[in-house]
């Protein structure tokens, strides 16, 4: 299997795991663990795993002796801010307030956001077709935020959807920022620093909440779901993302987010955690149409 095919497989697995995460994490929040407390646990657990793996690989001589250049530390701090702190805090808080399907649909706007940010940062010209697509996507996202009603424990779908959108924008910044780091360093050389910096950024938001959790009433099934989010949704998915982004462009990686609503919908509906309705279907059609126009290659 070629490196590109491995990267495509990794990107697909990321979408499957994230599609499951929308429902699995929703089962934990807010009944057993507040979103910010969950983020402290998630980022802290993943940080520990990354450092342990780095130490193991270093002791066994499986890592190059590259060191982070002082000039790249601002980029690492920025990656931690957009890819860990803002991204995860807004996503989990938003998911705790809205439904799995709505959150997954809004995440589809990420490819459009990446292209807009690329155009701003790289000074690329935006075509009329792309502007039309952005408008359609914005209408669909706004429609879902304002009118998308949810089932189950969704307590404030409008605010939740808005926070998920902020998360998508932040993730778009992260995809652009981290690209240079991946081509310069081994993944474990810089990812441990990104997560360590991110952990200290999220700690003030969630530590107080984390300390108030009554772990005695948390059932075993919830512990397994917390473990899934830490190990698979965070640790494994981050490594798979790095593998895919070494061979694929940020725009290509972002396009795989299109698969997340499919997997999230299948998983959520099969478990009775969410339902489809007219608002979600119409919003999805507008957003997907916008994404198609924005990412359509010029013939």
Label each region the model flagged.
Residues 50, 126-148, 202, 258, ...:
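Hydrophobic transmembrane alpha-helices of multi-pass small-molecule transport proteins
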Residues 24-35, 63-65, 96, 145-157, ...:
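Membrane-interface helix termini and inter-helical loops of multi-pass transporters
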Residues 28, 38, 42, 94, ...:
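Hydrophobic/aromatic residues within transmembrane alpha-helices
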Residues 1-41, 154-180, 200:
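Glycine-/small-residue-enriched transmembrane alpha-helix faces in small-molecule transporters
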Residues 17, 21-22, 54-102, 107, ...:
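Specific transmembrane alpha-helical segments of multi-pass solute transporters/efflux pumps
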Residues 31-86, 113, 170-177, 191-210, ...:
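Transmembrane alpha-helices of multi-pass small-molecule transport proteins
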Residues 19, 23, 80-85, 89, ...:
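Hydrophobic/small/kink-forming positions within alpha-helical transmembrane segments
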Residues 11, 15, 41, 84, ...:
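Helix-helix packing/entry segments at the starts of transmembrane helices
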């Amino acid at each position: 299997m070629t490196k590109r095919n491995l990267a495509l497989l990794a990107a697909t697995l990321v979408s499957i795991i994230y599609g499951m995460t929308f429902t699995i994490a929703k089962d934990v929040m807010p009944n057993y663990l507040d979103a910010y407390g969950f983020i402290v646990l998630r980022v802290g657990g993943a940080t520990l795993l990354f450092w342990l793996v780095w130490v193991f690989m270093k002791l066994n001589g499986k890592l190059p002796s590259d060191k982070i250049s002082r000039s790249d530390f601002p980029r690492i701090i920025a990656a931690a801010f957009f890819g860990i702190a803002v991204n995860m805090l807004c996503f989990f808080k938003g998911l705790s307030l809205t439904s799995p399907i709505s959150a997954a649909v809004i995440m589809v706007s990420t490819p459009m956001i990446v292209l807009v940010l690329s155009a701003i940062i790289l000074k690329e010209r935006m075509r009329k077709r792309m502007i039309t697509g952005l408008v359609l996507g914005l209408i669909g996202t706004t429609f879902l935020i304002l009118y998308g009603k949810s089932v189950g424990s969704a307590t404030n779908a409008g605010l939740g959807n808005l926070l998920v959108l902020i998360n998508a924008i932040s993730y778009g910044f992260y995809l652009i920022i981290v690209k240079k780091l991946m081509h310069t360093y081994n993944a474990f050389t810089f990812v441990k620093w990104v997560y360590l910096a991110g952990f200290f950024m999220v700690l003030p938001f969630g530590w107080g909440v984390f300390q108030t959790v009554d772990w005695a009433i948390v059932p075993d099934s919830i512990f397994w779901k917390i473990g899934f989010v830490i190990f698979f949704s965070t640790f494994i998915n981050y490594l798979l993302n790095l593998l895919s982004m070494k061979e694929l462009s940020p725009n290509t990686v972002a396009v795989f987010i299109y698969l997340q609503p499919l997997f999230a919908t299948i998983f959520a509906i099969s478990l009775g955690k969410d339902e489809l309705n007219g608002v979600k279907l119409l919003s999805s059609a507008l957003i997907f149409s916008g994404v198609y126009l924005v990412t359509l290659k010029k013939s």
